[in-house]
Amino acid sequence: MKKLLTIILSCLCACSVHAIDPVKQSGQLQVKGAQLCDQQGQPVILRGVSLGWHNLWPRFYNKKAVQTLKQDWNCTVIRAAMGIMIEDNYLENPEFAMQCMTPVIEAAIKQNVYIIIDWHSHVTKTAEAKEFFGHMAQKYGKYPHVIYEIYNEPVEDSWTSLKKYATEVIGEIRKYDPDNVVLVGCPHWDQDIHLVADSPLQGFTNVMYTVHFYAATHGDSLRKRTEEAVKKDIPVFISESGVTEASGDGKIDAESEEKWVEMCERLGISWVCWSLSDKNESSSMLLPRATATGPWADDVIKVSGKLVKGLLKKYNTK
């Protein structure tokens, strides 16, 4: 624990705390080879936080929380995890889902921070995803802030079936939005990036593939697999990661997290950390007594949140 606290403090003290305007700075994102690039074609790394499931922690889906994450935590990207499973999910209650998602998306646009619209599911719902992302592309496709994550974490799907799904959903998005980046999940909880490397999608531009890691569970093996994919010119985006075990709970492994972040920085991979929520688990960053909006004092930020906030302040500073 002493070493963990030392790491947190060193991150917090390593740099200035001034926020930047990432969209004003980088503009329309594009993918060149394995690299996410800015409007000028220069490499860019996005770093930020994922909100928890909208249907479990809706109180954090508000414009002031977005403002806090951008201005106080130095996030350059925020992920809005729209739940497709569990009670009150988007399929059961789309009106409630959009009451949560819309303020976050529009606050991100106003704050000039990138926003990931995440279809947070573990099962395929092709028709529903096409309809949703078609609507999102029509409404928000004109904004360079928007990134579409079309499938959070496939579990049982083969890469062959995921390619078919992605082709249909991306095709629907591209009817209305030819440019904004699309994130595609890969098999087995976004672990099997090697299958993507052997047979990537064809016929689309500005597409990236997601890898998810939890530092106390995933180590050298997945890091090696990810690096090998990048060396094969596969553009990787870590749209969800945790400093804990894969369950979202358990021990915090700051040393493994440092290795992951070092690899991401070296390879130019963007990374997002899970989650802004108040669940009784170690990857949840806030205590239940934290306000819905922030700013959040240190006494309501849990150890994982302090570690993530410190890393963001260290790396997202110009």
Per-range role (PLM):
Residues L4-C13:
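Sec-dependent N-terminal signal peptides
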Residues L12-C13, N89, G250:
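Alpha-helical transmembrane segments and their juxtamembrane interfaces
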Residues N93-I117, S121-T126, M136, Y140:
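Metal-dependent enolase-superfamily TIM-barrel catalytic cores that perform enediolate-based chemistry
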